């Protein structure tokens, strides 16, 4: 049975452009990166986070004043990997707009709400889910206790990030994240995870990147 990732990569379209030096071919994602569009797709893990961070840093170096658009369709994943992307979004100079296409769950929802104020969007049929971090451990009792303390510390830090970007109280965030909380795009806007639900690209495309 073929690797589904390999099959997927073989299906990525190529775009051919005419230049003064002849034809140049790009895969579709590289071509969209030229337009300052980044895709956060699939589970959040170290390899994926490294690629996203590299793209953010590259686009900052290319033009530190021009917005970057981040399209998110992710079920979430590793907390530390997601925080690497989050910290880089806050670190770089360009404003980063975020748009949920499909789903933004767990760390995906944190990245969605971490976009620049008034530049956080969702398509109307997307789903957003927030919850507290989870983990399973085995070993000596002392080690299990240390891991539990680290999970609680991460939970507190994630809650603080949601408070910062949603405007909700710490108690409201703590209650919302106690269990899996699924939100429609409209409910996510009311909660402060996004700024607006959009079904058409704005006439002024600047906040979404051209």
Swiss-Prot record:
UniProt-listed Enzyme Commission number(s): 3.4.21.92
Enzyme class: hydrolase
Active site as annotated: 106 (nucleophile), 131
Gene3D superfamilies membership: 2-enoyl-CoA Hydratase, Chain A, domain 1
One example of a Gene Ontology biological process annotation: protein quality control for misfolded or incompletely synthesized proteins
HAMAP family: ClpP (MF_00444)
Protein name: ATP-dependent Clp protease proteolytic subunit
């Amino acid at each position: 049975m073929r690797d589904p990732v390999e099959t997927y990569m073989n299906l990525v379209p190529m775009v051919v452009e005419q230049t003064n030096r002849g034809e140049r071919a790009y895969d579709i994602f590289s071509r969209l990166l030229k337009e300052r569009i980044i895709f956060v797709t699939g589970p959040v893990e170290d390899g994926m986070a490294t690629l996203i961070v590299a793209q953010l840093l590259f686009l900052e170096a290319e033009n530190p004043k021009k917005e970057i658009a981040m399209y998110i369709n992710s079920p979430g994943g590793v907390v530390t990997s997601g925080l690497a992307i989050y910290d880089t979004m806050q670190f770089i100079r360009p404003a980063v707009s975020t748009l949920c296409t499909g789903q933004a769950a767990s760390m995906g929802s944190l990245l969605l709400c971490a976009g620049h104020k008034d530049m956080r969007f969702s398509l109307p049929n997307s789903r957003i889910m927030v919850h507290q971090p989870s983990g399973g451990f085995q070993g000596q009792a002392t080690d299990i206790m240390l891991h539990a303390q680290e999970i609680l510390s991460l939970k507190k830090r994630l809650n603080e990030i949601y408070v910062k970007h949603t405007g909700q109280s710490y108690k409201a965030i703590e209650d919302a994240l106690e269990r899996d909380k699924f939100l429609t795009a409209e409910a996510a806007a009311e909660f402060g995870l996004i700024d607006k639900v959009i079904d058409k690209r704005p006439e002024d495309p600047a906040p979404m990147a051209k």
